[in-house]
Amino acid sequence: MKKNTLLLVIGAVCLAAAAAVYATGASAVQTAREALAALQEDYSKVQAIAYTGFVDLDSEAPVSLDEMLYFPVADSEVGTMADFRALLGRVYTQSKAAEVLDYCTGTTRVLTERDGRLYRADAYEPGWPIGPELEGAKWDGDALTVQVTLEWNEPVPGVVTLRPEGGAWKIDGIAQAA
């Protein structure tokens, strides 16, 4: 009788472990979907301002700085560098937000501020357009690694790392899949 009881206990433990693994996998995908959906509007605005340039610009008030032509950003929500930093902070972790800001103001120099207004160069980069479908997601400690499609001219597999910060899921990394 003890042998049968032991087998039942082992079977129950294995079943519980399998259910936990399945549930974790399912909840990772669901959590990723919900997190990316919550970020979508702000993420799209970051893409427009930081990369593609598909944001309203005031073409009547250009400024030439360091041999580049800039136009004031004509967006009701993002009109200053502080507004843009706040937008980045809603989408990205602190470290990733700093990286994106440095890229925009240093590496590519598409953004600058003058007299308290945010200015953008009239330039285009493809950015990181995340497709609507998730290919999968898995937990990595407290982070989520999400397989997505980056919708460039030719869609390619991508990986987004989401991490909780300040009570919300934020993007901590995004890259083309290896």
Region spans (language model):
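Short beta-strand edge/turn micro-motifs at domain boundaries
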Residues: T145, P155-A178
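Low-complexity, intrinsically disordered/propeptide-like segments
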Residues: V9-G11, A18, A137, Q147, ...
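Surface-exposed, charged secondary-structure patches
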Residues: R109-W152
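Generic structural signal for short, solvent-exposed loop/turn connectors between secondary structure elements
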Residues: Y22-Q30, C104-V110, G141-D142, L150-G158, ...
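Gram-positive cell-envelope targeting signals
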Residues: M1-Y43, L88
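Intrinsically disordered, low-complexity segments enriched in glycine/proline and serine/threonine
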Residues: T5-L6, K138, W152-E154, G166
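Core segments of small alpha/beta cavity-forming domains
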Residues: T31-R114
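Long, acidic/polar, low-complexity amphipathic helices and coiled-coil-like
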Residues: K2-T5, T149, V160
